[in-house]
Amino acid sequence: MATAASTSAAAVAAASRLLVRRAPPRLLRRLPRAALAASRPSPPSSSSYGAAAVALGRQPLGHRARMGHTAAAAAAAGPALGLTKPNAVEPPQVSFAAKDVEFSEWKGDILAIAVTENDLVKGSDSKFENAVLKKLDGQLGGLLSEASAEEDFTGKAGQSVVLRLPGQGFKRVGLIGLGQNAPSTTTACKGIGESVASVAKSAQASSAAIVFASVGGIQEDFKLTAAAAIASGTVLGLHEDSRYKSESKKVHLKQVDLIGFGSGPEVDQKLKYANDLSSGVIFGKELVNSPANVLTPAVLAEEASNIASTYSDVFTATILDVEKCKELKMGSYLGVAAASANPPHFIHLCYKPPGGNAKRKLAIVGKGLTFDSGGYNIKTGPGCSIELMKFDMGGSAAVFGAAKALGQIKPPGVEVHFIVAACENMISGTGMRPGDIVTASNGKTIEVNNTDAEGRLTLADALVYACNQGVDKIIDLATLTGACVVALGPSIAGIFTPSDELAKEVAAASEISGEKFWRMPLEESYWESMKSGVADMVNTGGRQGGSITAALFLKQFVDEKVQWMHIDMAGPVWNDKKRAATGFGVSTLVEWVLKNSS
């Protein structure tokens, strides 16, 4: 991801050879040949694509034979740095059911009641005026009104309290504040689900029910969406990524009943959808949370292959190694990958619907930098956040999270290609240098004036590859620019597209997902700053309008006949307060695919 803190550090390449140059001859005679070979400069070349041939002791055959690493280099990589391995922690497994029962007769661990501030209004007799609360309070002998007053519960949004009330069919009552009004958005309903998870965790409950005090508070045409959002919010609220902690917390909640949302196949299908979607979001979050010494490009490819194996009735996986990427002339992608000891993996999952009758073909492309050091324009200085650059594969996490969810949902009538050019952007003697020129697979040449603007270089070849699949529409997602975070803040992703139709589709999908997007301009006049004197283009323009020029760069690698959208998600990929990934993008992508299915 390009950041303002990037700076050139060309002298780093020579540092590894300094000791050997100064060592006395007697010491040089004692050094093993491998150490001496590593200390010598690589043979001169017109490119910076890597030196697999040199590493194997052979003379180079020109830059096309030296673009990256080999399978032998991958095998020699050894175990994960620091011997870190994730613990086997199962994500929350919760069953949801919509029930038409009287809430006061429900039996289980905790009855969660969602209340507005107005629901808590009391009459002159100090009793609740709301029918649901009044009935429950009477059943409890006035304990509910007394306990809520003692806890100073006022029904404000986000407020919750758990009351122990023995002797009932339910062991506890949880009150969840909604604010002044009943929820009317997906985001608000997800928040209710998160509150259900919170009160259930505090009570270590294995079963829960959710009911609204204002029976008519949720609009009838919104109930199905609300039920799914509450279920999704509950699962995501229960999830805590403890794979890298010495102790993990157990999830007790196994059953949640939704009362007052109707019953039957339609609502049951919505609740299943919520569970399927949540599993994809959790998968995406866990990919981003994984450190770079564990989640290498090879491991990311393995995770993608596992999706294809698990849902083999609708998925196939193709993983391209370096040699195949050379054949496809992916010089832009391989240039970024050249410095890393971990070889790149180009990942292509293909979803074909049951029955194989697809009326539309879509592609979803994700940036897959499993770590971004910035390269020779190394990230340094305050605010560079180099320690967080494991999240530079957030676009690919959204892609594969959506793939996992869609493998379970199995939408008809649509074929979807999930494409990620996975690699690391590191620093070494084989690395891409500022000023190098790389050639993308569509033949366009790029002068690299900033090695920390690497994501767009990998996406260039990925977009060309996507267009070659004969797709109708492409969405790419990337943690691409700090400029977009400056413009839109940490919660909103920027979208760039010349297609009004595609913009409307994603806007409609985001209304259901609750994720926030803002359409940004593709100002063509800004392309002037992207022109090179020696190549077709440079990879970065000036500081002003950086997210726009980045999008204009990507546009050069998309066929004009294909509808295309770029999503810059550098802000919402990460939650600074929780110090964890958000799973952003998965829900909107799934909704978009469903809207394109028959």
Curated annotation (Swiss-Prot):
The lineage of its organism: Eukaryota, Viridiplantae, Streptophyta, Embryophyta, Tracheophyta. It is found in: Plastid, Chloroplast. The keyword Repressor does not apply. Mn(2+) 2 binds at residues 372, 452, 454. Belongs to the peptidase M17 family. SUPFAM superfamilies: Macro domain-like, Zn-dependent exopeptidases. The active site is at 379, 456. This is Leucine aminopeptidase 2, chloroplastic. It comes from Oryza sativa subsp. japonica (Rice). Keywords: Aminopeptidase, Chloroplast, Hydrolase, Manganese, Metal-binding, Plastid, Protease, Transit peptide. Homohexamer (dimer of homotrimers). Binds 2 Mn(2+) ions per subunit. GO terms for cellular component: chloroplast; cytoplasm. It comes from the Eukaryota. GO terms for biological process: proteolysis. It is an enzyme of class 3 (hydrolase). Presumably involved in the processing and regular turnover of intracellular proteins. Catalyzes the removal of unsubstituted N-terminal amino acids from various peptides. It holds the Pfam family Peptidase_M17. One of its GO terms (molecular function) is peptidase activity. Residues 1-71 form a transit peptide. It catalyses: Release of an N-terminal amino acid, Xaa-|-Yaa-, in which Xaa is preferably Leu, but may be other amino acids including Pro although not Arg or Lys, and Yaa may be Pro. Amino acid amides and methyl esters are also readily hydrolyzed, but rates on arylamides are exceedingly low; Release of N-terminal proline from a peptide. Its cofactor is Mn(2+).
